[in-house]
């Protein structure tokens, strides 16, 4: 598809008509309020695909009771500007009735990787994620779909779903984009003041402390966690949900093994805002992490 202004489409029929021609299609699923992290996904798709489809849909089925669905930031004009600058061809912006019409009754539940950590803290969250992602994959039928590594467990859930259900798509993980402070970019950062965002970078510092302990030879998971917990204890406003060292199947173990998918994940509430982050632990994956984009 020749590069022109990004087209905004709201119906499934419009999307399928626009994608009727030949060429590799890349999908970037988002909930909107785009930032540089999303732009990195779009640029990666642009470099690898002939047509890039960005979806913007605040999916109600992945929000729990008393979560922030009603106040989740929305700004389609801002999203369109980011999409065009990064190189998206199509912006698919369906409403809830398009994605979940009257009588809709199907939910996708991915076992195993979806159950601990975020799955335990936010019951039903990954069912909503898996359901909407599978719908988007069926609507767009891309060769590749791009997800940020910041949502590491979500990436694992999507990969497992695609594998188990034989969906013909390659799932591409894109490294986390961070502020110079180390804070992982997130649409929910908009809830925080600049001072609060600076203090929220303690999550990144805690993860780095765990990495450093592992690099020094520590293999006991409890002691690795303690290195991170000691950093988090410096912030009086933090309400920690979890700090976990997990393998590729999201399982916590007593000792770190030589698994390239070993990851350190953290979730906490700071100033009333729930934030998540993660970094790789193994040397090979850590070298990849050192090449993460930064929002400078």
UniProtKB/Swiss-Prot annotation:
Coiled-coil positions are none
**Catalysed reaction, written as an equation:** (R)-pantoate + beta-alanine + ATP = (R)-pantothenate + AMP + diphosphate + H(+)
Q: Which gene encodes it?
A: panC
Keyword Mitochondrion included in the entry's annotation = no
One Pfam family hit: Pantoate_ligase
Q: Give the family from UniProt.
A: Belongs to the pantothenate synthetase family.
Q: Where does ATP bind?
A: 31-38, 148-151, 177, 185-188
Name it. Answer: Pantothenate synthetase
Q: Which domain of life is it from?
A: Bacteria
GO BP annotations of the record are: pantothenate biosynthetic process
Entry-linked Gene3D superfamilies: HUPs, Pantoate-beta-alanine ligase, C-terminal domain
| Organism expressing this protein natively | Deinococcus geothermalis (strain DSM 11300 / CIP 105573 / AG-3a)
């Amino acid at each position: 598809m020749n590069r022109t202004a990004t087209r905004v489409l709201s119906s499934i029929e419009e999307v399928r008509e626009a994608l009727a021609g030949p060429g590799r299609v890349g999908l970037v699923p988002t909930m909107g309020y785009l930032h540089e992290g999303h732009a990195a996904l779009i640029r990666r798709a642009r470099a690898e695909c002939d047509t890039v489809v960005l979806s913007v849909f605040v999916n109600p089925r992945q929000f729990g009771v008393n979560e922030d669905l009603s106040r989740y930031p929305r700004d389609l004009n801002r999203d369109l500007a980011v999409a065009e600058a990064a190189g998206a061809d199509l912006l698919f912006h369906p409403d809830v009735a398009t994605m979940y019409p009257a009588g809709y009754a199907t939910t996708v539940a991915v076992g195993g990787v979806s159950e601990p950590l975020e799955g335990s803290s936010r019951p039903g969250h990954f069912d909503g994620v898996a359901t909407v992602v599978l719908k988007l994959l069926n609507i767009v039928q891309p060769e590749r779909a791009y997800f940020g590594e910041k949502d590491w467990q979500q990436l694992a859930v999507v990969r497992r779903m695609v594998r188990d259900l034989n969906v013909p798509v390659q799932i591409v993980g894109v490294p986390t984009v961070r502020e110079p402070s180390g804070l992982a970019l997130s649409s929910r950062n908009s809830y925080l003041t600049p001072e609060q965002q600076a203090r929220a970078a303690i999550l990144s510092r805690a993860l780095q402390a765990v990495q450093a302990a592992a690099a020094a030879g520590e293999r006991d998971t409890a002691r690795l966690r303690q290195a991170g917990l000691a950093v988090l204890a410096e912030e009086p406003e933090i309400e920690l949900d979890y700090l976990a060292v997990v393998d590729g199947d999201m399982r916590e173990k007593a000792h770190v093994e030589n698994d390239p998918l070993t990851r350190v994940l953290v979730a906490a509430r700071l100033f009333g805002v729930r934030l998540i982050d993660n970094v790789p632990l193994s040397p090979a994956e850590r070298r990849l992490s050192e090449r993460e984009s930064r929002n400078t």
